[in-house]
Amino acid sequence: MTVSTKRLSDGPIIRANMDGRMGTNINGPSLIECPHWVPDPLGVYYLYFADHRGTYLRLAYAEDVKGPWHTYEPGVLDVAQSSFVTETQLDGEFDYPHVASPDVHVMSKTGEVRMYYHGLCENGDQMTAVA
């Protein structure tokens, strides 16, 4: 079996500072086709992503996978809504409050959209949670 990939456009689909809150670090994208049972969808495609030092998980949406993409400026999950710390006295290189690396799955049988993500625990470990 041969697997190949093809770039759909010449530039990035998500750019730094697409909205006033986003910042410049964009990583960990997870794309889904919005399920038909989601009420009032923003678009056909949802792209979840983060800033590894960010305090919220972001969402972009589009009618076509090629774009144009628009950001949902409030984001979808703030660190304060997660089970992770919002403040810390730790001083290690990676010991800052954050939520990042969204991995989103459509659970058609249960009518759920599950998002796995990670963040910082009180002891400095980084763990995965689900929303």
Where do the model's predicted regions map?
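Beta-rich carbohydrate-recognition and catalytic domains
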Residues: 1-99, 105-131
